[in-house]
């Protein structure tokens, strides 16, 4: 293999693939490598991790002098390319070594036998007619994902459904992005008619998708089909710019959460988001940002009164003004960080809290941002 390639174009690809490569996985070392494949008219780059595989194709600003393929350490190769100043780079495979050359630089990198890492390349020669296709605006998708990402479980659950986002298009009229750790729930609605579908995508892949700033238009294509072998998984192929991403979603049943929003509240209050946010941040500072710190919240017709007590450090009382109040007074215990993450995902300043009582989950929403709804379970 021997190719001439523009350094800036190569650098852009490698920066993206660095988000795929895992450099310190001793159990699965092939996750730290990058496969470079030169064909007559293009160069393909492959990388994978335990969650998904990615292929990037470059067909411009290249000159393929000799076809071939080579596997190298991904992070090291990326850092070396980033440090080169010249615009044109020669990459050549020779005697199980990768030569990286410019007018002023000559680098030899050891390569790996391709037979040792058969899973680094996924089968992209599939008939897309066998797949259903979902086209969605990348900007709208990433906006929704960023708003609900905090609700995804940060623990590696025995069931993977809480380690990702559920794409719920089951009614064919909207797409609901749903995330939960079983204590908090966030749902973002995208108004778009589709054929019915439902699948879960791990946050590792969603973070990779969020890292893109599409150059070829704002649409992202997600092709999906249930695996015919067992119906226990759904195969996804995602096209974004010159990247093709392969992912297998395990068909676990995500809870039916939309019905949770349909209740008659006993108490409803309207508050300024930033006032509550500032109060919670002070409480968490006192609690030294303890993730599971609980505080008591008294809901009155004039204020939310939030009491917190940190052993051996101190105590605080925060009062947040109620702009509107309907219903009954109540006391409820909440996780301070979870409540902060929930309200901070809203862009609007006024938010509404809907309570069913002291021992039931409550709803957080905004009339100015109706596409986002969140639920928090009280703590005991």
Swiss-Prot record:
The keyword Transport does not apply. It is found in: Cytoplasm. Keywords: Cytoplasm, DNA replication, DNA-binding, DNA-directed DNA polymerase, Nucleotidyltransferase, Transferase. GO terms for cellular component: cytoplasm; DNA polymerase III complex. Pfam families: DNA_pol3_beta, DNA_pol3_beta_3. Disulfide bonds: none annotated. It comes from the Bacteria. InterPro entries: DNA_clamp_sf, DNA_polIII_beta, DNA_polIII_beta_C, DNA_polIII_beta_N. One of its GO terms (molecular function) is DNA-directed DNA polymerase activity. Its main location: cytoplasm. Confers DNA tethering and processivity to DNA polymerases and other proteins. Acts as a clamp, forming a ring around DNA (a reaction catalyzed by the clamp-loading complex) which diffuses in an ATP-independent manner freely and bidirectionally along dsDNA. Initially characterized for its ability to contact the catalytic subunit of DNA polymerase III (Pol III), a complex, multichain enzyme responsible for most of the replicative synthesis in bacteria; Pol III exhibits 3'-5' exonuclease proofreading activity. Forms a ring-shaped head-to-tail homodimer around DNA which binds and tethers DNA polymerases and other proteins to the DNA. The DNA replisome complex has a single clamp-loading complex (3 tau and 1 each of delta, delta', psi and chi subunits) which binds 3 Pol III cores (1 core on the leading strand and 2 on the lagging strand) each with a beta sliding clamp dimer. Additional proteins in the replisome are other copies of gamma, psi and chi, Ssb, DNA helicase and RNA primase. This is Beta sliding clamp. The lineage of its organism: Bacteria, Bacillati, Mycoplasmatota, Mycoplasmoidales, Mycoplasmoidaceae.
């Amino acid at each position: 293999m021997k190719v001439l390639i523009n350094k800036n174009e190569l650098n852009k690809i490698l920066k993206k693939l660095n988000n795929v490569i895992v450099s310190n996985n001793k159990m699965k070392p092939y996750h730290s490598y990058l496969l470079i494949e030169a064909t007559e008219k293009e160069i393909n780059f492959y990388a994978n991790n335990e969650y998904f595989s990615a292929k990037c194709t470059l067909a411009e600003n290249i000159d393929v002098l000799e076809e071939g393929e080579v596997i190298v350490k991904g992070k090291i190769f990326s850092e070396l390319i980033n440090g080169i100043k010249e615009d044109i780079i020669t990459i050549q495979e020779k005697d199980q070594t990768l030569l990286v050359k410019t007018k002023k630089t000559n680098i030899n990198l050891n390569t790996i036998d391709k037979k040792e890492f058969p899973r680094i390349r996924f089968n992209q020669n599939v008939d897309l007619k066998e797949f259903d296709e979902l086209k969605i605006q990348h900007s709208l998708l990433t906006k929704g994902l960023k708003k609900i990402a905090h609700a995804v479980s940060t623990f590696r659950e025995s069931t993977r459904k809480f380690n990702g986002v559920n794409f719920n298009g089951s009614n064919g009229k909207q797409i609901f992005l749903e995330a939960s750790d079983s204590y908090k729930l966030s749902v973002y609605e995208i108004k778009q008619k589709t054929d019915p579908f439902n699948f879960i995508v791990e946050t590792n892949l969603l973070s990779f998708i969020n890292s893109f700033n599409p150059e070829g238009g704002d649409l992202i294509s997600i092709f999906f089909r249930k695996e015919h072998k067992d119906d226990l998984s759904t195969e996804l192929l995602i096209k974004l710019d010159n990247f093709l991403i392969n992912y297998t979603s395990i068909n676990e049943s995500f809870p039916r959460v939309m019905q949770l929003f349909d209740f008659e509240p006993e108490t409803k209050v309207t508050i300024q988001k930033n006032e509550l946010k500032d109060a919670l941040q002070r409480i968490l500072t006192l609690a030294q940002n303890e993730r599971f710190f609980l505080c008591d919240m008294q809901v009155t017709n004039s204020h939310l009164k939030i009491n917190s007590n940190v052993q051996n450090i101190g105590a605080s009382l925060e009062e947040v003004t109620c702009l509107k109040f309907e219903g009954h007074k109540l006391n409820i215990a909440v996780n301070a960080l979870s409540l902060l993450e929930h309200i901070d995902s809203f862009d609007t300043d006024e938010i509404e809290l809907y309570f069913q009582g002291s021992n039931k989950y409550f709803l957080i929403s905004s009339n100015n941002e109706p596409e986002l709804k969140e639920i928090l379970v009280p703590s005991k």
